[in-house]
């Protein structure tokens, strides 16, 4: 509505695209929540030495639909980000919206790993390739978003749009927070892991980093209003990291 109804206002254009991106994340999270409805089967499956499919778990079709939906939402987010970035020459607001959408796409992609890990462990079909690849996917997405943010900050120094880089760094930290769930599921699946109790510290550390960046930006906001929005966004992202 904001994008179509206020096409001449750059603020509404940016806000509209960002809200739409958050909607895609909400759709991915709802898929993750749906896949967790039978989470209680995971401990029993993990204790089971065999790889026999648990009949109480999801069907193959349900598993594929859950993973497929998250993949679809992620592809939409990436395509959306690419289209916006391709229009950067039309105005800085397209660059800002496209960059943030790219960060949101990284989170959507990270949630694919979470949904796939949960769904497969519920069916007892989680294998060694899953144990290796899903955590890597989330860590790669977090690294991409974080480095993307650093590049924006350094490459656009002196430009108001460079403050978007701090938001990208925060979105990258959210990906790292998600990685804690995926890594924990992978590390304790059918094996013991001595540092399992330490993994939950990852969300705490990422949240503290977000809040530290937010505090820094609040100070900068006293000299430059361009830091007003990213400072508050990082506080919200810090809260998300705790979840």
Where are these predicted regions, by residue range?
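Alpha-helical transmembrane segments and immediately adjacent membrane-interfacial amphipathic helices
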Residues: 1-5, 14-40, 61-86, 96-121, ...
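Membrane-interface helix-boundary motifs at transmembrane edges
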Residues: 126-129, 189-195
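Non-transmembrane, juxtamembrane loop and terminal tail segments
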Residues: 40-53, 125-129
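Alpha-solenoid ARM/HEAT helical repeat scaffolds used for protein-protein interactions
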Residues: 90-91
């Amino acid at each position: 509505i904001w994008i179509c109804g206020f096409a001449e206002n750059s603020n509404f254009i940016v806000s509209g695209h960002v809200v739409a991106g958050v909607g895609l994340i909400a759709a991915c999270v709802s898929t993750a929540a749906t896949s967790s409805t039978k989470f209680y089967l995971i401990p029993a499956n993990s204790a089971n030495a065999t790889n026999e499919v648990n009949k109480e778990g999801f069907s193959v079709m349900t598993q594929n639909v859950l993973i497929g939906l998250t993949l679809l939402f992620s592809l939409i987010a990436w395509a959306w980000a690419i289209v916006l970035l391709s229009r950067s020459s039309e105005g800085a607001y397209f660059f800002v919206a496209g960059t943030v959408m790219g960060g949101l796409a990284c989170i959507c992609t990270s949630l694919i790993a979470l949904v796939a890990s949960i769904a497969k462990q519920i069916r007892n079909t989680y294998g060694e390739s899953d144990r290796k690849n899903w955590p890597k996917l989330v860590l790669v997405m977090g690294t991409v978003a974080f480095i993307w943010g650093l590049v924006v900050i350094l490459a656009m120094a002196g430009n108001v749009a460079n403050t978007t880089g701090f938001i990208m760094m925060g979105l990258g930290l959210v990906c790292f927070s998600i990685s804690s769930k995926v890594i924990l599921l992978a590390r304790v699946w059918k094996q013991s892991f001595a540092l399992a109790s330490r993994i939950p510290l990852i969300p705490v550390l990422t949240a503290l980093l977000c809040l530290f960046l937010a505090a820094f930006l609040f100070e900068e906001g006293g000299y430059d209003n361009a830091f007003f929005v990213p400072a508050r966004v990082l506080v919200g992202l810090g809260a998300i990291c705790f979840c």
